[in-house]
Every structure is written in structure tokens, then in C-alpha cells.
Amino acid sequence: MYLKALDCYNSSVAMFNDTRDSLTSKDEWKISYRSQHQHAYTGLWRSLLRRGKITEALLAAEEARSQALKDLMDFKYGSNAESYWSPFQIRSAYDSLSDVASSTIFMAVSGPVIFLWVVQGCKVHLRATEFKEFSSEEELTTLLNRLYINALKEIGTRTVKCENRSLDDDRSDEAVVEDRTPHDVFHPLFREGNTLKRLYDMIVAPILDLIDSKELLFVPEGPLCLVPFPAFVDSKSKYLSEAHFVRVIPSLTTLKMITDCPVDFHNSSGALLVGDPCLEGVLYEGKSLAKLKFARKEVEMIGEILGIEPLVGVAAKKREVLGRLSSVALVHIAAHGKMETGEILMSPNTTMENGPPEEKEYLLTMTDVLKADLRARLVVLSCCHSARGEVTAEGVVGIARAFLGAGARSVLVSLWALGDEATLEFMKYFYGELSKLKSASEALNRAMKCMRQSEKFNEVKNWAPFVLIGDDVILDLKKS
């Protein structure tokens, strides 16, 4: 029975992949198409699990992740990388996973179960946590969304005071998810309180005995893409980031494509710092936008640390920014941004003599970035909740994904808006560590530690929103 089901799912997935390939460069179409056929991809790896094929199931689940992003990166790197899983030609699992970092935690949600694969070198372990209180994946997803809301409430993200750099919905982070979450939830699991510990117990505790490295690499799915892993709390009230560096990747394949590209593909020197572009006279969607004085302070402070002159105000023209993207190793942007589409507002190329400028004169789109040949090792997006976006079967579709697809080796983003002074303090610590040739992952971890140890910014809301997505990189900023 399972063999017949496996054959059917294999054939379906192969057909869906062929159809998706025919969509060529239509990224939005691919994302929508992938979501419509989630059942086939899930059915494939679940069928493999029923036959006890743990590693093959992991590879099949991986093949379904971030497919449209992989296509963007294929175009960027020209790698024509093979998927980890080929339904008609199963390669050696050891060969497929030999370059996966340890400890890598691949997560999947199916039915009322959270599946956790832990990759240690060529060894793959599986732990599954079933929520017997629920009968469907929809109910479990509702729980995860509710835990996300509760975590934000307990962290206190609503109390953050900062200048608004977001071009998205003005509602709170919680309200956006509330719309998708039923209100008639009375089960004890939905209660508020100790949410960060409950998330630890659900995701980390089941695999704790399998973790054997300082760095944890998470490959999340669904609502788990938005949770603050570094702030998870163990039974001894210690944060996960106190024991481990934490990094996130969209899929195993996308990371492999980055690490397999030629050594000289990404730039080794140069930095572009952009803050508070002048938007005087600009009407975006009929609205004028305020100046971002703290964004300006932010890049000016970073410029002093690195010895680099930032582009601020009128100097931060779209044309100037695009002209520099291809030649720098570091890009830091503190400006108005739209998380779902990856658009960022720059100073217009034209003057106001002929009236308000057209959007194309100041709106930096991902199409623009792709054409500009971005080759940065690290992109830091200081645009409010830049880690967020629409959660789909493809993954989180937002500004961070856009920059990875455009060629960034790694992207640092934030899950929620941070206070203005806290942002300055964090960036001071982060870039201080980067300038000492610490890797981005270690610099992030050390900056979090410094914030926790400070008297003014030790609350979780001030240090836990940051997420490093992609590869870990070291920048020799003295070359800049």
C-alpha cells in the first residue's frame, strides 16, 4: 500500500516540478503554485517515514523547501545545483548530507506532529512530538500562531518606542497574526505565560541529547519561521543564546548553493552604509514620510567604527546606491522598507522642480537589486521588522528572502521593531565585534550578551529580535 502511495507521490511531485520549471522567471507564480500542491510534497516524505526511511524523508522534505528562492539563486550563481532529493535517482544519503553543518535542525509540521531531523555530519536522527490533544495540522498551526502572539506580548514588543521605518500595515505584529487565529481557543496549551520556555520544551528539549556543537542551524517551517530562537528559555532559566550561536536558513539546498559558489564571487572588501534618505516631497501611496533621525545616527555611528563615510539624506540617491551594490562586501540600510515585497525607499534621482517624483525614481525594488549584481557577504536591513513577511509553503516571503535571492551571502534582519536607543547600542556592539574579525554569527551572539548584561537594555525585547539568515561570514572591514 505504502509503495503504491510512494509511487503516486513521486510522480505527482515530478510533474509539479516540471510545471513549475515552465514558469521560468515568474517568482510570484511559482510561490502560489507551490502552495497549491503542498499535499503532494508532504505526502511523499510522510510515506517515506512510514517505511522507516528517515534520511530519504528528510531529503524529500528538503526538496520541497524554498523552491522559488532556489531558482532565483540558480540564476544568480549559475550553479544548476542538484536538489538533495531526486525521486527517480536516489543518491547516497551520506554523499548528499556530508556538507551539512552540525548541528542542523530541520523542522516540519504535518498533522498534529512537529518533526525534527537533527543532522550530525552524515548521521541523521529524527524526533517527533505529537500533540494528541489535536486532530489536525490546522489545530497545531493555530497553537503555534497563538504561541507566537503570546511570546510577543510577554516580551513587550508593543511597548517599544521607535521611529517608524516600516511601509507595511500600521497594526501591531500580534494583530496581523490574530486575524489568522481563531478566538475560540480554550485549551490549556493556548494560555499565556512562560511561552519562551514552552517553545523550548516543544522544539529544543526533544533533541537536546543530540546537540553537540556550539552553533545551531535551524531550518524552520510555517509559524516556526517567526519565533525568536535565541530567546528560548530552558529548565534552568537560561536563554538558548547563552549556550549557542543561532542561525537560520531557508533550506539546506540554498545554503549549499551559497557555500559552493566560487570563493571570489562575493566581495571581500568595501562597505555601503545608507541611512535616512531624503524623501522631502515624496508621496508614497499618497502619504508623506517622516525623517529618520535615528537611522542617520545609526549609520553615522557605524561609519565611525569602520572609518567609512555613509550615504545619508540627499546623498542616498537610488542611482548612487545601485551603483555601489556590486562592489562592496557589506551593505547596511537604515531606511523605510516594505517587508513583504522587499522595496526600500531611497532619495529620488530627480529634483522637485517638476513636481513629486515618480516611484521608479526613489523606490529600490528587488528587480533593481538583481540587475545591480549584488555580491555582498553581509546585508544588514535595519527597517523595523525586516525578518517578517508572508508565511507560505515556499517559506517567509519578504525583504530578507529578496536580498538572499539577489546574491547576498547572509542577511541580518529583525523580527520586531526595536527601540531607537537600543538599536544604536546593539549596532555598536555588533559592528565592534565584526571589526575584530569575529564571524557574523559570533558577533551577533556577543552583541546579544552585551545587551543582556547592560543595565538599560537587558530586556528580551531589546536583544532577541535579530536573526542571521544564510551563511556565516567574516568581514575584514579594515580593507574597506
Describe the predicted segments one by one.
Residues L58-Q67:
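Catalytic cores of secreted or luminal carbohydrate-active enzymes
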Residues Y2-L3, A14-T42, A68-W85, F457-V460:
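Acidic, Ser/Thr-rich low-complexity linear motifs
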Residues P87-N145, K161-S480:
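Catalytic cores of enzymes
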